Design a protein with these regions (language model features):
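A short acidic, glycine-rich active-site loop
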Residues: 56-71
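Glycine-rich, Arg-bearing micro-motifs that act as flexible, cationic patches
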Residues: 111-133
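Short, hinge-like loop/turn segments at secondary-structure boundaries
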Residues: 52-56, 106-107, 130-131
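Structural beta-alpha unit
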Residues: 1-2, 30, 78-112, 149
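Small/aliphatic-rich secondary-structure junction motif
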Residues: 2-55
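General small-molecule cofactor/ligand-binding pocket signal
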Residues: 38, 88-92, 143
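Short, flexible loop segments at boundaries between secondary-structure elements
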Residues: 140-148
Length: 149
């Protein structure tokens, strides 16, 4: 487990996620680990009408989301990741918690560093949070950076 050689840091581009990137960078620098900045493009909710999708191209929309996510990841990489850290970006599609755990497993990551948003209420009780699910699904340690850290 220690030292960490590969760290996956998923981001949703929120302020708490930037804090997780900072923590992941510090750990990657300390352990000379590779850092993978990951963004998961969630499923596109589509409501089909009796007349079809009325010209809505779901595949084109998903490509646009991927392109936008790639650009945002590159910006985060340039802005938050020191040159001393060996880092790369990755965009995948699917349900966030499953994809984060899958990527970490496929990449043979030693650690996942992610943020918590402190969500509460009925959505959290019914669906759970992404960090909680990642902790359940992941095959490696997960470091959750709290909103107030």
């Amino acid at each position: 487990m220690l030292p960490f050689k590969k760290i996956v840091c998923p981001t949703d581009f929120s302020e708490p996620a930037c804090r997780a990137i900072k923590a992941a960078c510090e750990m990657a620098e300390t352990f000379s680990a590779e850092l993978i900045l990951l963004h998961v493009v969630g499923p596109v909710p589509v409501l089909e009408t009796p007349t079809g999708l009325a010209g809505f191209d779901v595949a084109a929309y998903q490509r646009e989301l991927s392109n936008s996510a790639n650009a945002s990841l590159q910006t985060r990489l340039e802005k938050h990741v020191p040159d001393a850290v060996n880092a790369r970006t990755l965009v995948v599609h699917g349900e966030p918690a499953h994809e984060i755990a899958r990527v970490a497993n496929e990449e043979a990551a030693d650690l996942i560093v992610l943020s918590t948003h402190g969500e509460t209420g009925w959505r959290h009780r019914i669906f759970g949070s992404v960090p909680e699910k990642v902790i359940r699904y992941a095959h490696c340690p997960v470091l959750a950076i709290h909103l107030d850290s």
